[in-house]
């Protein structure tokens, strides 16, 4: 059975506390945007509007190629960055999430991750101390209004 975009990671958090549903590469938003963009390009016959020096065939091949990017199952199921230090550490400690680590509050543990995600520690504390389904519903509500993720919740072009 084929998994629908977003459903593949809807209820999953990574070891690091990131909600996988918010990842536009893994949740299918980029693939869905590309699919719909291709439909619009074909429907409006944009190849007739393209400049003469534009290789429309290669452009369409690029769109088709992006649509073949597989959905990510999330790092808990073997997806994501295979060299992720956070995942490696959690697996070595046999933890379902870094939120259960007794070293979470130590400043040096998350320095590299905090450069990209300044609220990562707070997110980990959140997922440990709240009902995950409530948090997911809150995040989904927020995601519906954010680009490019909102494309996953639109049924029509």
Regions found by a protein language model. Give the residues of each.
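Cysteine-centered metal-binding/redox modules
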Residues: 1-157
